[in-house]
Amino acid sequence: MAAAVLSGSSAGSAAGVPGGTGGLSAVNSGPRLRLLLLESVSGLLQPRTGSAVAPVHPPNRSAPHLPGLMCLLRLHGSVGGAQNLSALGALVSLSNARLSSIKTRFEGLCLLSLLVGESPTELFQQHCVSWLRSIQQVLQTQDPPATMELAVAVLRDLLRYAAQLPALFRDISMNHLPGLLTSLLGLRPECEQSALEGMKACMTYFPRACGSLKGKLASFFLSRVDALSPQLQQLACECYSRLPSLGAGFSQGLKHTESWEQELHSLLASLHTLLGALYEGAETAPVQNEGPGVEMLLSSEDGDAHVLLRLRQRFSGLARCLGLMLSSEFGAPVSVPVQEILDFICRTLSVSSKNISLHGDGPLRLLLLPSIHLEALDLLSALILACGSRLLRFGILISRLLPQVLNSWSIGRDSLSPGQERPYSTVRTKVYAGLELWVQVCGASAGMLQGGASGEALLTHLLSDISPPADALKLRSPRGSPDGSLQTGKPSAPKKLKLDVAEAMAPPSHRKGDSNANSDVCAAALKGLSRTILMCGPLIKEETHRRLHDLVLPLVMGVQQGEVLGSSPYTSSRCRRELYCLLLALLLAPSPRCPPPLACALQAFSLGQREDSLEVSSFCSEALVTCAALTHPRVPPLQPMGPTCPTPAPVPPPEAPSPFRAPPFHPPGPMPSVGSMPSAGPMPSAGPMPSAGPVPSTRLGPPTTANHLGLSVSGLVSVPPRLLPGPENHRSGSNEDPILAPSGTPPPTIPPDETFGGRVPRPAFVHYDKEEASDVEISLESDSDDSVVIVPEGLPPLPPPPPSGATPPPIAPTGPPTASPPVPAKEEPEELPAAPGPLPPPPPPPPPVPGPVTLPPPQLVPEGTPGGVGPPALEEDLTVININSSDEEEEEEEEGEEEEEEEEEEEEDFEEEEEDEEEYFEEEEEEEEEFEEEFEEEEGELEEEEEEEDEEEEEELEEVEELEFGTAGGEVEEGGPPPPTLPPALPPPESPPKVQPEPEPEPGLLLEVEEPGAEEEHGADTAPTLAPEALPSQGEVEREEGSPAAGPPPQELVEEEPSAPPTLLEEETEDGGDRVQPPPETPAEEEMETETEAEALQEKEQDDTAAMLADFIDCPPDDEKPPPPTEPDS
């Protein structure tokens, strides 16, 4: 045919190829080639002039080849262009000439189809109206249906391009479209399908101009809705669904919206009436239509013997119209009455075959029931597509509806032999398609297979349709014993076996059957199940996953070995592909408690690559790539460097601190007794453990780059060096894991006053611009109830009180922890290091425990679910969903609702936090007042004790002076030098070899924070004693850790800070030196007096120091019990 196209016009001068016989080899450009092709087609269609030789291809012979010629011409690309205008002009003239003749009208339409699609814009605008008139003339003739079909196809393209040009759009709308619709309505019955195609094109591209004929069009469509031809019925339904958009609408399409809703309610009312007529008496509790719709006036044929068939066909057409109205696009936002549509669907699907009588026309009604259910399921799918995830409030109804339909159509499915199609497979396929669509739209929120009776029923049906049929061999008993028991009685002679022809059965290998039987329902069930597992897998129960593993893995191996094939649905490549897809879904979305079958899946996919079907083998290759990415990732995963001790349970990732997020709850582990506390080894703990007296610190701490959660800080955030935990500011509390002490050293004892009675110390805020001795500013604005102890350098720490029982559990703070660095050790300006030592982040908040002071933190309610009850209800009607609205309107509405909900939640959270803080601060103020009263009483007692001790010392000194000066005064004056004054940092002289002096730290300040209320919790007998001590600097701690066995350096004298207030230690020392200058006379008296005076001096110094510190920070000292001997602090 191509040779005929190129050689048919060799005689014409315009069609000749320049360059002689070079042919296409002489053509250098594509446009030139298309021009030659156009001229060749023109030469084929028109006779040669000026020649007596007859044409090689007469026009009547070239007409059958013309559609093929047009298609071949389109293969070469667009024929439009400035260089082809002359050839296109020749084709336009030729097309108009052919359209005017009845015999050549089909050829003219073929040329016109090429010109409409390939002509440039200028040529199209010039000839569009004339072409439209020519087509209208063709529609008014009595041409054959093939010519009418081609004319309507050209009309559709003509209207599509004309709607893009405003001038042509206005001209055709006002002057030509009503006449065109009238011509289409007047076509004869055998051309009804072409007429519907033309009307659909007019309503699609020119909806406003069709408004004048809306009534006539509606009647025409309704008369064809119940047509017996499926194509004609589908076209009529599509045209009827476009009726609400016809005509001119007001602003924002209000009139169109009202028309759409009116048509929808009319369809619902008519469908309810038809369903009642079809199954009158078969419904247990029929739902009456209460909508505003008016029933349609459908044509009725009197004397029709098949009334039920006509009603069924009409029901099918109106249900399709309703589904198309829901699923097709509409120009204005509309409201869908979801509850009314679901009521109709449930009413239709509740008609069961068990309730239909088998007398009269009952069998015919039963015969029609599966098709009625199919239409209802199609309508449900259209509703899901139209409303999407906004149907979640009806999710329970939908999840119950699907297994109900499967139960009603599972009768007699197990009694058939393999190779036969099971009954009602089409209905079950439609149910599984709806399941897949519902899960695809709503995801894990669909709630499918997540427990309940409906989920178990659905899973049972899915597994039954997926499992291949098994060949059942029925063993028949001997003829003499119907029950199969052996015959007893007198033995008889053996008889010869006779061949029973009636019992001769064909072997199972030679059986008539369909190899693709049940493949559709099996593929649909596999597809729906794999989609459900992929979207809802982690939420499905572990038992369901195990059941699927037990079914799928042997089935895959049987398919690969050829054992399952034969008469099973897995002979179809589509079912095998969906089976592999289900296996991949089980691998990608496993249950948290059931490991995925990774090794078996890898083997199965590897063997699946050898499948004969390219579709199956290519899917297995893709699945292997996915599995390889899971098992061997190209980038190593981020594994946090946690502590060396194993964690007993997986810990969720830490969340950023937020004032609206409650701290994670960790249940407190059991508190072991002090005696049974392990001294070494890992001790996993689920939460902070309250301390009971001095707990030996056996902590194997995380590295210096780990935070308090055991995660690597460098992998999370870049923390400045000052905030990194270091040994000089990180104290192991009772809520931390134990570590081993340095080599050979006993575990140091942490007094409970350092842990503040077992509580986690609250951070104190220290603000400084430069680390200098004179620039320390202490700010306690956020923790006004805390107390701070500043201990001068060199002062020995007060010994801890003996442990007396377990302390009460720690109380959770009412608010979120505030991140603030602790106070670093104060250093001299000349020894200030270039990089300050790292500091630890604030400790995590302890878990909330039940107690009188514990306040529940505010919880953040997720958006869209107030109170966690369910999805938000609509303001006006819960059963109406707006669809087809613009994205901007929906986003503005959703943003407005979300902002209002967030503001309400934030106000509630802030109100709760303010109430909690007010209650907390009121309690703290009461405790402070009680402490002030106790402090005043203790201060008075301290002053009285000091006066009594001063009087006793003066009396003792007077007695000593009288004794000394009375007996040997001159010897004393001429004797040796006076005894040296004991410095305050030295231990008592009673046992100098037992007590080792502490290493002298650099000058610094120690901040210890104690929450008031600890004394009330401990009671009067176990009140915590403040143990002030000086923190060592970083360098000294490193030296101590590096050489723990090394001896302590010699103590240095305490230097007075220029910015610190003058202490009373030096004055007391000087007074003590003046008073104890004379040496004793006798050794016994001397020793007794020295011991007495040393003890009194030490007690007084400690009491004075405590009083001075209490005056400085208004913190009452605890002097109710005499302090035990000083112990060395590690």
From Swiss-Prot:
Residues 774-786, 886-964, 1083-1104 have a biased composition (Acidic residues). It holds the Pfam family PELP1_HEAT. A motif (LXXLL motif 4) lies at residues 155-159. Residues 672-684 have a biased composition (Low complexity). A motif (LXXLL motif 8) lies at residues 364-368. A motif (LXXLL motif 10) lies at residues 579-583. GO terms for molecular function: chromatin binding. A motif (LXXLL motif 9) lies at residues 459-463. A motif (LXXLL motif 3) lies at residues 111-115. Residues 473-494, 639-1130 are annotated as: Disordered. A motif (LXXLL motif 1) lies at residues 33-37. Belongs to the RIX1/PELP1 family. Coactivator of estrogen receptor-mediated transcription and a corepressor of other nuclear hormone receptors and sequence-specific transcription factors. Plays a role in estrogen receptor (ER) genomic activity when present in the nuclear compartment by activating the ER target genes in a hormonal stimulation dependent manner. Can facilitate ER non-genomic signaling via SRC and PI3K interaction in the cytosol. Plays a role in E2-mediated cell cycle progression by interacting with RB1. May have important functional implications in ER/growth factor cross-talk. Interacts with HRS, RXRA, SUMO2, HDAC2, RB1 and STAT3. Interacts with PI3K, SRC and EGFR in cytoplasm. Interacts with ESR1, the interaction is enhanced by 17-beta-estradiol; the interaction increases ESR1 transcriptional activity. Interacts with CREBBP and EP300 in a ligand-dependent manner. Forms two complexes in the presence of 17-beta-estradiol; one with SRC and ESR1 and another with LCK and ESR1. Interacts with histone H1 and H3 with a greater affinity for H1. The Glu-rich region mediates histones interaction. The Leu-Xaa-Xaa-Leu-Leu (LXXLL) motifs are required for the association with nuclear receptor ESR1. This is Proline-, glutamic acid- and leucine-rich protein 1. It comes from Macaca mulatta. The lineage of its organism: Eukaryota, Metazoa, Chordata, Craniata, Vertebrata.
